[in-house]
Every structure is written in structure tokens, then in C-alpha cells.
From Swiss-Prot:
Catalysed reaction, written as an equation: IMP + NH4(+) + NADP(+) = GMP + NADPH + 2 H(+)
Record family assignment: Belongs to the IMPDH/GMPR family. GuaC type 2 subfamily.
The name this protein goes by in its record: GMP reductase
Family annotation (Pfam families): IMPDH
GO cellular component: cytosol; GMP reductase complex
Single Gene Ontology MF annotation: GMP reductase activity
Taxonomic source organism: Polaromonas naphthalenivorans (strain CJ2)
InterPro entries reported in the protein's UniProt record: Aldolase_TIM, GMP_reductase, GuaC_type_2, IMP_DH/GMP_Rdtase_CS, IMP_DH_GMPRt
Length: 325
């Protein structure tokens, strides 16, 4: 098995078939909807809030609302009242089952539900998937996070409509340091490994540092990528604004950090400051244009044409130089 990550890979261009990158279609389908780009902001308190979710839904982007200190029922009511889709996160504890029961009782069916726990290859996830499929069969269920083909196979067999791949590769995740487990440093290889057995969409979660990493994720089997740090340092980001030496930053912390949990227990995340680097609309537009450029370099016109290109594995501490044809 090859071991590499985003900075070890470059994709090889093919003959261009378009006159302008604007001719390339960067959209992707997930469930019953098509979205403008294969990018979803991480479902974290310092990345998304209700205002961002509403804006994204109204403008053709996918979102997943976080599950912390949130009334999921009220959120679903509000989104449906605005005439946009609802996409929520759940855990696997009793209050999450209670939330499902209350949604059913009120006739509220979120279009997307993400089962969001750190180690998603678990019997607790199997039970929650079964409960959702029994009580909210119309909802599209995303389950994670996982890191192995065995986990992807199990989650799909248990009924998940998509899986989320990535354990600890994110900027504020310290799982690999705290536990010795995870995909930090080889997230792209893990994605490739998992995609070989997947029959349903994969969301690659974590480790994205540059816009080009989106195209690399698509090449190795992702349908969509979940991005945290690059979308945490925006003017609209919910994290607290902090001034350091005259420069403005946004607070960004992991979902398993003590900052998020409010207690120092089972901590696998940390807090950092992200420089404020612009507005959400401009960042997403730039991402779309860069994905369109990637499609043109791939010699294609649609997003999945990127999967047809060859790639080079660059020399690095985790890989050997190699040309994959």
C-alpha cells in the first residue's frame, strides 16, 4: 500500500478541451440535490452557525450544522420555514435518540443527517443508523468518521448513504498524539484505500490545506471534502475575533477540545488562531474557480473527469518518488 498525503501528490495534466475554465462544471450531487462545489464546511462551532447555514442553503452549497449547544428541532423548523433544506448532526447517546423521536412526533424530517462521532466504526453507530432508517427513512444519512475499508463496508451495509473518512488529520485535531491512531499524515492514502471498496459517496474530512487538495481528494475517490481551518478564518466565521499585534484572528478549536466540551475530559482537540482572510462568498467563489481550473487541467468538463488523470508521488518522509500511470 502506498503511503502519501496531499503535499506528496501532484496530478498530471491532460489535453485541455475547453476555451475557458468557466465552461467546466464543478457541481456535485449528494442525495437528491446538486451543489455548486464539492466542499462542505466542517460541522464545528467555530466554522458554521445558523446564519452561515441559511446562506449556504440559499446559494446552492452543502452544509452540515454542528450538534453542540443547539436545539436541533428548532433549527429544522427554522430552515424549513425559510424554504431551504435542513442538514443536522447527531451523536449516538440517549439525547440524540430523543431528538429523533421529537422530530418524528412533529413530522419534521431533515433532508440530511450526519452521525458525527470521532470513531465511527462502532456498534453505537450501527444502532443509530438502524434507528434513523426505521424512524426517518427519507433522510439521507452520512456516518463517520472512519479510516479503513472495513469500516466503510460496514457502515454502508448498516445503511449509511455516505461515509465520512478521516480520523485526526485536521489542523486542530490531536488524536494521533493522544491515542496513536488516525489518518494524520496519510489522509489522502486512507481516502484512496477506502474509496476502492466504497459503493456510496465518501466525504473526505480533514487535512485540506490548499484549494488544490480539493481536486486531489476527488481524484482519489471523494465525492465531497469537509474543510475546517480554511473556512474558520473568515469575517463571518462564528469563532471569537481576537487581535494580536494589530492583526485580526478568529478562534478555531476542535470538536473534541476542552474549549468546545467545556470540560477537560477525553480531549482530542486544541485551540488555534486563524488569520482573518476574507469573506465567505469570495472564498467559495475562488474555490469554485480553482476546481474549474483543475477540471480543465484534467482535460475534462465535469468534476469527476478529475478521476481519470495520472499522478506523481513526490519524495518525502512518507513516500518514495514514483510515477503512477
Amino acid at each position: 500500500m502506498e503511503i502519501f498525503d496531499y503535499d506528496n501528490i501532484l496530478l498530471l495534466p491532460r489535453k485541455c478541451r475547453v476555451e475557458s475554465r468557466a465552461e467546466c462544471d464543478a457541481s456535485v450531487t449528494l442525495g437528491q440535490r446538486s451543489f455548486r462545489i464539492p466542499v462542505v464546511p466542517a460541522n464545528m462551532k467555530t466554522v458554521v452557525n445558523e446564519d452561515i447555514c441559511v446562506w449556504m442553503a440559499q446559494n446552492g452549497y452543502f452544509y452540515v450544522m454542528h450538534r453542540f449547544d443547539l436545539d436541533n428541532l428548532q433549527f429544522v423548523r427554522d430552515m424549513q420555514a425559510r424554504g431551504v433544506y435542513a442538514s443536522i448532526s447527531l451523536g449516538v447517546k440517549q439525547p440524540d435518540y430523543d431528538t429523533v423521536d421529537r422530530l418524528v412526533a412533529e413530522g419534521l424530517a431533515p433532508e440530511y443527517i450526519t452521525i458525527d462521532i470521532a470513531h465511527g466504526h462502532a456498534d453505537t453507530v450501527r444502532k443509530m443508523i438502524a434507528y434513523l432508517k426505521n424512524h426517518l427513512p427519507e433522510s439521507f444519512v452520512i456516518a463517520g468518521n472512519v479510516a479503513t475499508p472495513e469500516a466503510v463496508i460496514d457502515l454502508e451495509n448498516w445503511g449509511a448513504d455516505a461515509t465520512k473518512v478521516g480520523i485526526g488529520p485536521g489542523k486542530v485535531c490531536i488524536t494521533k498524539m493522544k491515542t496513536g491512531f488516525g489518518t494524520g499524515g496519510w489522509q489522502l492514502s486512507a481516502l484512496k484505500w477506502c474509496a476502492r471498496v466504497a459503493t456510496k459517496p465518501i466525504i473526505a474530512d480533514g487535512g485540506i490545506r490548499e484549494h488544490g487538495d480539493i481536486a486531489k481528494s476527488i481524484r482519489f475517490g471523494a465525492t465531497m471534502v469537509m474543510i475546517g481551518s480554511m473556512l474558520a478564518g473568515l469575517e463571518e466565521s462564528p469563532g471569537q475575533t481576537v487581535e494580536v499585534d494589530g492583526k485580526l484572528f478568529k478562534e478555531y478549536y476542535g470538536s473534541a477540545s476542552d474549549f468546545n466540551k467545556g470540560e477537560y475530559k477525553h480531549v482530542e482537540g486544541k485551540r488555534i488562531l486563524e488569520p482573518i482572510k476574507g469573506k465567505l462568498v469570495d472564498t467559495l467563489r475562488e474555490m469554485e474557480e480553482d476546481v474549474q481550473s483543475a477540471i480543465s487541467y484534467a482535460g475534462g468538463t465535469r468534476l469527476m473527469d478529475i478521476r481519470k488523470v495520472n499522478y506523481v508521488v513526490l519524495g518525502g518522509k512518507n513516500s518514495n518518488e514514483d510515477l503512477m500511470m
